[in-house]
């Protein structure tokens, strides 16, 4: 009886022989049980793309100092911001292009291209000998870093409907952990000849290039992921007509017959129409806008936290070494992983993605207000309060972003997910381009107003971060943020 049911189900779905997307759909229909293998693949690929994004922040302060471009100590944050934003500028310029390519040629080729580019350009960044080489290699790394948008589409296609929240949670968890573990690696492995002289001599490669070891480590991991990606299935369908509803079949068939004629030029027109329909899809566009605002906060916070922790106490910082910053971020990564695996799916099921985003954003505000006061502590109390605040901020930030990823993928069909996520990546990258540059300039400015009457020093920095969060939370209310009925 069960076999007859399966056959009837497969026949009803009208799968196509030789279509990789149909093979995945068949697998989803017939498979029972938790998708551990697929979840592992998604998790490790997204982790590989997020590791290099923030890995430079713990040592960027010292890297800029070594380049000798900053005239004074207070100018270091200014130059650090431009190195940080070059990655996002590159990604902003290419995200839509990679999304369209993924919709046309498949997810798997784009995933392979992305992991290979990480291995190459991140290693070259570690070998940077001057300010402009650092900016150039980070720009190229961002230009070819096309994985996040593609992986969001891929994750929504490889899992059954009941695991969609888990899929998006896996994407955002791996992304968030990569943004934490990456800086932790940067903190522990930068300047190895100074920290571990028994292992690395000053005359060795890592003694001459003080920041190459964390970059090479991440590149080696990306190479390993590239090999694993050869075994993942393609999810894009290579047929179009049979999956459409009978109500639309006549119109689409007529359009297809016109497209087959070279004289009509309908194909390009239809593609432009599809692109325009995405821009008019308000559930998609509203969720992308909120997503961009919260991502702006996320990237600005990441850079400011590292600069603030590294900066001297006389400027309101913590005077932390790269190792100490790495320890805080590693602990935050553990807390984030535990929360996203065990708590977030339950929270999303209970509250829904909109409320999760709203509540998470609101809770970040009082925690960020406490950071300048935490800097006044010392010893065990400083470590305890700083680690608790860092864990909470990272957990809440990733939870808010996860809810928006779910809303974005619910707002479009499969044929548009690559392009939709490309639009989201472009918009987000533009905001994240502003984030590091703005954060560096803001931080440098705050160190010049330590005795100001209104929000002196780091108080101003964290106040601006809270303003961004308040805007993001306000946009989660109707009529601005609407959800799709798909």
Curated annotation (Swiss-Prot):
Phenotype caused by lack of the gene: Zinc sensitivity resulting in increased chlorosis and decreased shoot fresh weight and root length. Accumulation of high levels of zinc in shoots.
Report the subcellular localization. Vacuole membrane
Q: Which InterPro entries does the UniProt entry name for this protein? A: MFS, MFS_dom, MFS_trans_sf, Tet-R_TetA/multi-R_MdtG-like
Does Calcium count among this protein's keywords? no
Predominant subcellular localization, coarse grouping: membrane
Task: Spell out the Gene3D superfamilies in the cross-references.
Answer: MFS general substrate transporter like domains
User: According to the UniProt record, what happens if one changes residue 472 to R?
Assistant: In zif1-3; zinc sensitivity
**Induction or repression:** Up-regulated by zinc and manganese. Not induced by cadmium, copper or iron. Down-regulated upon nematode infection.
Pfam families named among the record's database cross-references = MFS_1 (PF07690)
* Superkingdom, taxonomy of origin: Eukaryota
Tissue specificity of this protein: Strongly expressed in developing leaves, differentiating zones of root tips and sepals of developing flowers. Restricted to vascular tissues in older leaves, mature roots, flowers, anthers and filaments. Not expressed in developing anthers.
Give me the Gene Ontology terms describing cellular component: plant-type vacuole membrane
**Does Transport show up as a keyword for this record?**
yes
GO BP = response to nematode; response to zinc ion
Membrane topology term reads:
Multi-pass membrane protein
Q: Which UniProt keywords apply?
A: Membrane, Transmembrane, Transmembrane helix, Transport, Vacuole
Transmembrane feature ranges: 41-61, 82-102, 109-129, 131-151, 170-190, 212-232, 288-308, 327-347, 362-384, 391-408, 423-443, 461-481
For molecular function, the Gene Ontology terms on record are: transmembrane transporter activity
Q: Which family does it belong to?
A: Belongs to the major facilitator superfamily.
Q: Which PANTHER family match?
A: MAJOR FACILITATOR SUPERFAMILY DOMAIN-CONTAINING PROTEIN 10, PROTEIN ZINC INDUCED FACILITATOR 1
Q: What else is known?
A: Overexpression of ZIF1 confers increased zinc tolerance and causes interveinal leaf chlorosis.
What function does this protein fulfil? Major facilitator superfamily (MFS) transporter involved in zinc tolerance by participating in vacuolar sequestration of zinc.
Q: What is this protein called?
A: Protein ZINC INDUCED FACILITATOR 1
- The species this protein belongs to is Arabidopsis thaliana (Mouse-ear cress)
Gene name?
ZIF1
């Amino acid at each position: 009886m069960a076999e007859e049911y399966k056959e009837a189900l497969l026949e009803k779905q009208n799968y196509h022989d030789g279509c990789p997307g149909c093979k995945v759909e068949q697998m989803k229909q017939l498979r029972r049980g938790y998708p551990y293998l697929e979840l592992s693949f998604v998790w490790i690929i997204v982790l590989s793309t997020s590791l290099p994004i923030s890995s430079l922040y713990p040592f960027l302060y010292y890297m800029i100092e070594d380049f000798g471009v900053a005239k004074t100590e207070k100018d270091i944050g200014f130059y650090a911001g431009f190195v940080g934003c070059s990655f996002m500028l590159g990604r902003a310029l290419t995200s839509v292009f990679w999304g369209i390519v993924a919709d046309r040629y498949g997810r798997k080729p784009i995933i392979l291209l992305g992991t290979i580019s990480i291995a190459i350009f991140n290693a070259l960044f570690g070998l940077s000998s001057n300010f402009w080489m650092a900016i150039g290699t980070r720009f190229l790394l961002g230009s070819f870093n096309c994985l996040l948008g593609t992986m969001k589409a891929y994750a929504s296609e490889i899992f059954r409907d009941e695991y969609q929240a888990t899929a998006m949670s896996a994407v955002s968890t791996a992304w968030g952990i990569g943004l934490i573990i990456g800086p932790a690696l940067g903190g522990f492995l930068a300047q190895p000849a100074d920290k571990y002289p028994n292992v690395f001599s000053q005359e060795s490669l890592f003694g001459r290039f003080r920041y190459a070891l964390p970059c090479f480590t991440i590149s080696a991991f990306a190479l390993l992921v590239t090999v694993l990606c050869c075994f993942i299935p393609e999810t894009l369908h290579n047929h179009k007509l049979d999956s459409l509803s009978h109500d639309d079949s006549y119109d689409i068939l007529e359009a297809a017959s016109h497209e087959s004629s070279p004289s009509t030029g309908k194909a390009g027109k239809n593609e432009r129409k599809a692109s325009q329909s995405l821009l008019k899809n308000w559930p998609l566009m509203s969720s992308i806008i909120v997503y961009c605002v919260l991502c702006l906060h996320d990237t600005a916070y990441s850079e400011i936290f590292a600069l603030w922790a590294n900066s001297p106490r006389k400027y309101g910082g913590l005077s932390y070494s790269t190792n100490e910053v790495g320890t805080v971020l590693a602990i935050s990564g553990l807390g984030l992983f535990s929360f996203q695996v065990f708590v977030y799916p339950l929270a999303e099921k209970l509250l829904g993605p909109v409320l999760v985003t709203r509540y998470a954003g609101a809770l970040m505000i009082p925690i960020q207000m406490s950071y300048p006061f935490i800097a006044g502590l010392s010893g065990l109390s400083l470590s305890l309060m700083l680690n608790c605040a860092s864990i909470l901020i990272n957990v809440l930030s990733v939870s808010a972003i996860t809810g928006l990823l779910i809303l974005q993928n619910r707002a479009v069909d499969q044929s548009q997910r690559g392009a939709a996520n490309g639009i989201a990546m472009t918009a987000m990258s533009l905001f994240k381009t502003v984030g590091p540059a703005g954060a560096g300039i803001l931080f440098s400015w705050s160190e010049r107003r330590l005795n100001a009457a209104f929000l002196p020093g780091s108080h101003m920095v964290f106040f601006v971060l809270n303003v961004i969060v308040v805007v993001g939370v306000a946009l989660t209310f109707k009529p601005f943020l609407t959800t799709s009925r798909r």
